[in-house]
Amino acid sequence: MNKKILHVVSSDAVKERVFQLINSSKNEEIVVCPTSLFYGKLPKNYTKKELTATALSLQKYSCSDSLYEFTHRDYSVYNKVIVWHGRNAEEILLLYWMADLTKDNLYEIDVADCKEVFEEFKRTSLYHFPVIFVEALEIEELERYDWLGEYLKKVGEEQHSQYKSNWEYWRNKRSFLRVCRDNDWVIDSVDEELIVKMMHDIMNSDYYHKLPDWVKYAVLLSIITYDLYVDFSHLFVCNRIADLVLRNNKEITENGLVDLFDIIQWREAYQFENFGRFRRLQQVNKRLLAK
């Protein structure tokens, strides 16, 4: 009987890398996690209603069906369910989640276990926090190593239980954002209380009081966003989360700082649109004059 192997990855980009690394055959499959795990709501259970709520919280309205398929897949038919991961929150949480969805056939490949790859990544990384993850590695670099032979590890019973317990903790913890700031498996939770504390630290500083009111909100938003984000691909999400918390904070809204910020944004958008129209008219005039 042929052994069936399933590779579980965090994104389509990682899927492309893994596809080139394995000797793909009809007995090997690759599945991509259909949701983001580093921000938003994690499913507390696997009912259709709960998974739809998870998709809605992430504004991924079309992924509730794929979430249901992912969580209700029969993982027991595979001899090995292999999770490819590094040390960022997204990939660590995927490993924990798979421990909840599997029994005794879970395996892992941690790219940080390869000392050469790990040290080179830390030396050359341009990320805000140099936390290694699979998608950050180029296929040419990955192809130099025998990942399935040298770095594949079976998750033992005790470790499996710990991973499953970790997933239980995180899916019941309310947090806007989950990030790793080092390669030590420690996941930091970002909630409203933490963002408000960061806001107060900035507002209590001397330089903040010297700023004109019309730039204060922009300064708060940019500093908090920078302190939250781990890598450039997450910057927009961090900005949205910080903006959501600040806009609902009475200290900010009662001072009119949000209104001032929005007025400036609207004016800049209006000016940008007018500039666009002006440039289009310029191009038309040039073509007319050339005739």
Region roles according to the model:
Residues 22-25, 75-76, 96-105:
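Short, surface-exposed basic-aromatic patches at helix termini and helix-loop junctions that form
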Residues 209-227:
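Short acidic, hydrophobic short linear motifs in intrinsically disordered regions
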Residues 246-291:
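C-terminal engagement modules used by replication, chromatin/transcription, nuclear envelope/ESCRT
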Residues 30-37, 104-131:
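Conserved beta-strand -> loop -> alpha-helix junction used to position metal-binding or nucleic-acid-contacting
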